[in-house]
């Protein structure tokens, strides 16, 4: 069984999906502070930026 590598398109799609999930969680949290969630969102934004994705277009 060989190791399959992920294409850039697959990586971008998975990372966008992750960002969308985190945004939905943040939105459903209301005004409750969640530092771990905020940090996860920041990391995901950094990854998407590195991959050339403009997150302003996909932010809730």
Specify the residue positions occupied by each region the protein language model found.
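Short, charge-rich amphipathic interface segments used for partner binding and complex assembly
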Residues: 14-60
